[in-house]
Amino acid sequence: GIEQPDFFNAPPLARNPRDFWGRRWNLWFTQTTHRLIFQPLGGVQRPVFAASGVFVFSALMHEYMVMVSLGRFDGRMIVFFLLHGVATILFTVFSKSLGQTISLPRPVAVSIHFVWFIATAPLFFGPIDDIFALREWSWTLLFSVAMGWV
């Protein structure tokens, strides 16, 4: 048979946006968009342009799924993915300008990234909550599933 990659690699342990999106979250999607979007748009020769293309594609794809499900334009998915795209690109550009990846102690880096993710999570999980009409406990459940805790 065809070997399938793991979908997640301990997302709560991500140290930065690039680590989260490139090595820990939805690895099948990451590998697919790397091959079909990132590389054709210039890959490592044009990383800002190529990464922007991946995040714009992801934003539009997620927003389309929300729009079809809710029957209206929402916009939160677009904002979520554009914010995360900018954060990932800024982290990468800043690291390259230093000549190395920004290196903080693991607990500090993980905590900073976790706070960033929690701060932006309503933009991602809010539309999902609206689609499934989940209330009260839904944020905890959705976040726990997304983080691989359930």
Task: Report residues per predicted region.
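Membrane-interfacial catalytic/cofactor-binding modules of polytopic membrane enzymes
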Residues: 1-67, 100-150
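Interfacial helix-loop-helix junctions of multi-pass membrane proteins
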Residues: 66-77
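Alpha-helical transmembrane segments and their membrane-interface exit regions
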Residues: 82-91, 136-144
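Structural signal for the C-terminal ends of transmembrane alpha-helices
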Residues: 90-95, 125
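Short amphipathic alpha-helix initiation/capping segments at coil-to-helix junctions
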Residues: 75, 79-83, 104-108
